[in-house]
Design a protein with these regions (language model features):
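Histidine- and/or cysteine-centered catalytic micro-motif in compact active-site loops
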Residues: 28-30, 54-56, 74-76, 100, ...
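Short beta-strand segments
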Residues: 20-55, 71
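Helix-adjacent hinge/juxtasegments
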Residues: 60-90
Length: 171
């Protein structure tokens, strides 16, 4: 990271990942080309992250060819005029993580991953979860991404006095 003053610790980065409405997962496809997709991921242990999709398609082919992935999450991106010097900038909170993707084959783990996703994004509809699983488990792919190193975080944020908060300073 070029600007060390904006670096945040891995715990902070995990918070960003948990709060992000989606995380862009970057794959390398079977032809060696980059392929990034915004996906809805969920995790309970901060190491294993799950997403779901169709049983076939480009991302599954990419995982089979190159299971290494990069995750990028952003929770705040606010265009700002710098309070001190009038410069145009962005305030942001972001996280980057690296991991290995694997297509889940065991039904119990598929259900676990889907439950995490549903609990995160549609907790008010958990009463319909079992019916949905019965209807669609056999036609749903679930992928587990296991982080291979702690995520890194970065932010640009100003405090109430217009001073940039650097070196992990919190308000």
């Amino acid at each position: 990271m070029r600007k060390k003053s904006r670096a945040m610790d891995s715990g902070w980065a995990l918070e960003v990942m948990h709060k992000a409405p989606y995380i862009t997962v970057s794959f390398i496809d079977e032809d060696g080309k980059p392929y990034g997709l915004p996906l809805s991921l969920a995790s309970v242990d901060d190491v294993n992250w799950y997403f779901h999709g169709a049983l076939e398609g480009k991302k599954l082919e990419a995982i089979k060819a190159h299971p290494e992935v990069c995750l990028s999450a952003v929770t705040r991106c606010t265009p700002t005029v710098g309070p001190k010097d009038g410069s145009f900038t962005l305030q942001y909170k972001s996280a980057i993580a690296f991991g290995k993707a694997e297509i889940v084959t065991e039904d119990a783990e598929k259900i676990h991953g889907l439950r995490l996703i549903c609990e995160r994004f549609l907790p008010q509809h958990m009463d319909a979860f079992d019916q949905s699983i019965a209807r669609s488990l056999s036609r749903t792919a679930v992928v587990r991404i296991t982080l291979t190193e702690p995520p890194t975080g970065k932010r640009k944020q100003y405090d109430k006095e217009g001073v940039e908060m650097k070196y992990g300073r919190m308000e």
